[in-house]
Amino acid sequence: AGHTLAANGRYLTYDGKPFFPVSGEFHFARYRREDWERELRKMKAGGVNIVATYIFWIHHEEEKGVFDFSGQRDLRAFVELCGKVGLGVILRIGPWCHGECRNGGFPDWIQFQTDFARRTDDPTYLFYVRRWFCEMEKQVHGLLFGDGGPVIGVQIENEYRSYAEPDREKRKAH
């Protein structure tokens, strides 16, 4: 705790000193957990000071209602390790992520539902998204920058409306 991240009229500051953020991607669930620290230290040695990471829904709720944050899927352990190594974290939480992941990161059970529209304000879709976001919040509780943790930002959604859609009007509600 006690760190400050701010902006003045010309640049960002970290603890009152000029700060130039350099971000790199590391998709933790795609790496063996035992490799995380070595790879993060390589990133830091290369000048990266912020790690952006997708949290692919499909990796954590393969079966509807059954969440898995164990092993290489352990979001909390990954974020804590980033802090230990001295890296800030940007969580890219989706719900749709892309990241060259099947279904854009949607679990199959979401992708192939026919009773609600994905990536819209459909109440059923938003019910599942809210439940997913609440599960992620449990994992990172206390690790946000304001709490003294390394999480300095959160990206919601990804590449929205950046691809051809057959029914754009339905998607405007999102």
Task: Briefly describe each language-model feature range.
Residues A1-I50, E80, K84, G88:
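N-terminal carbohydrate-binding accessory modules
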Residues A7, E62-K64, V140:
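Residue-level signal for pocket-adjacent positions within structured domains
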Residues V22, H60-E61, R118-R119:
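A short, mixed-charge helix-start or loop-turn motif at secondary-structure junctions
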Residues V22-H27, A52-Y54, I90-G94, Q155-E157:
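A cross-family glycoside hydrolase active-site/sugar-binding cleft signature
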Residues A29-W36, D68, Q72, D122, ...:
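Solvent-exposed, acidic/flexible segments
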Residues E80, K84-H174:
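Active-site region of glycoside hydrolase catalytic domains
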